[in-house]
Amino acid sequence: LLSTAVFASAVTGLQAQNSLTIEQVKDGLYTISGSGGNVGVRVTTEGVILIDDKFPQDFAEIQELVSQVSDQPVKYVLNTHHHGDHSGGNIEYINISEIIAHQNARDNMLRGNQDAPPRLVFTDQTAIYLGGVEVRAFYMGRGHTNGDAVVYFPDLQTVHGGDLLHTIAPFIDYANGGSSKGWVSTM
């Protein structure tokens, strides 16, 4: 599964720039790169599903990049975890999209007084069905945090691992339930 195609929230040369870029991963699946975590963009005939939404100040640029690949609105945002570079844009999306995350990610957002925690949560797994496309999210256990979601696109055999996947080394957020032993098991 992981060997087919993986795109992670890793820091790359592109992310050192101030602006965001969009790149096609597979047909109907894109990644937006820039400072902080990557955003997954799954395009369907009935709307767009975002995996993470970066920082609040990135909202307009993300919307512009999405409009380059789809004329459909963002219907869902699935946060891979609570960190601001993955969920900070929730404040902009909360009134126009459904936001979904693992229960622990929501709890971490509330404990950290973050704006716009998700209204929809899951504990083990969930799925979004939109425009004939299925997107699944799984909680595999503690790792980067205690609320990491791994997102799977079955039709494309591709995963988005949030900050569970890094190009250099894993970052474990122990203060928010992260576990290096759990990360090994999760991976």
Q: Which residue stretches match the model-derived regions?
A:
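Bacterial N-terminal signal peptides
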Residues: 1-13
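Boundary of Sec targeting at the N-terminus
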Residues: 16-17
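Conserved beta-strand hairpin/beta-sheet module of binuclear metal-dependent hydrolase folds
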Residues: 20-65, 149-153, 157-163
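Metallo-beta-lactamase
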Residues: 24, 47-50, 55-57, 103-143, 145-147, 154-156, ...
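Divalent metal-coordination and catalytic microenvironments
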Residues: 28, 42, 52, 66, ...
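Active-site metal-binding motif and surrounding structural segment of the metallo-beta-lactamase
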Residues: 45-49, 57-100
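Active-site environment of divalent metal-dependent phosphoester hydrolases
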Residues: 58-59, 82-88, 106-110, 145-147, ...
